[in-house]
């Protein structure tokens, strides 16, 4: 027992000496490093850094405080000391401490840049946020209601309903068939005889100051064909029939027309021939050439083709 007690006393004394030696050595090493950092900090940091350098310089009275703080770490804290294996050198320590200080002061500047950029980005996001937030609210509100869906379908139905009448109301291209009755010689037609013959053949003076052939001989009903002045201005307007004269009149009908187009054409041709016979004139085609059987066949063929194209 006495031997064991002696061994424990020796081991405890050695441990205490080792801790004291370790504390003295580390305090001297830090004192040299802080002393070497002082000139470099004045060159690099200017007037604002002496405060920090003064903080690093500790008086001799503080060594006891440092020694007391160094007694607290356990044996695991000795790993950095054992792994370094390098005795402190003031020149090397000055370089490392200078680099550390540069890194310490460079990082806050970089962080400041980041914070400025983040602040600007946050400000831009705050400015843009209301525009992007309000629009979805306006769009989402109608989408949540079912009547909008009904309106969409009803809109499509109205489009279909509009397309059908348009397809039904598309009219074929208007065509005009023209016949002319021209005086045989140099003597023009006199209004008295001309108007009397026209009235006897069922023509009635009416709209646009020209004569019309209606479905009813009394001048009522749909217009089948019309008769105008062959000469300028084209009207048959007159105050005194005896003072009116013209070298010819023009019969015309349109395609499509009311009733049967071929029957209307035959009636128009028959009326033109009667008036030409009454006045001693000639029946001409649309180009003011004498009417021929071939040209009459061309008129009838035009009517048949028009009916077939619009059947």
Curated annotation (Swiss-Prot):
Q: What Gene Ontology cellular-component terms does the record carry?
A: cell division site; plasma membrane
Which locations, inside or outside the cell, does it occupy?
Cell inner membrane
> What biological processes does GO assign it?
division septum assembly; FtsZ-dependent cytokinesis
Record flagged with keyword Cell membrane: yes
Membrane-spanning segments? 6-26
Which InterPro entries has this protein been placed in? Answer: Cell_div_ZipA (IPR011919), ZipA_FtsZ-bd_C (IPR007449), ZipA_FtsZ-bd_C_sf (IPR036765)
Is the keyword Phosphoprotein assigned to this protein?
no
- The Basic and acidic residues compositionally biased stretches are 32-54
What keywords were assigned to this record? Cell cycle, Cell division, Cell inner membrane, Cell membrane, Membrane, Transmembrane, Transmembrane helix
Chain positions covered by the region annotation Disordered: 32-60
Give the matching SMART domains. ZipA_C
Q: Known Pfam families for this protein?
A: ZipA_C
- What membrane topology does this protein have? Single-pass type I membrane protein
Q: Which family does it belong to?
A: Belongs to the ZipA family.
Q: What does this protein do?
A: Essential cell division protein that stabilizes the FtsZ protofilaments by cross-linking them and that serves as a cytoplasmic membrane anchor for the Z ring. Also required for the recruitment to the septal ring of downstream cell division proteins.
* UniProt name for this protein: Cell division protein ZipA
Organism name: Vibrio vulnificus (strain CMCP6)
Q: What is the lineage of its organism?
A: Bacteria, Pseudomonadati, Pseudomonadota, Gammaproteobacteria, Vibrionales
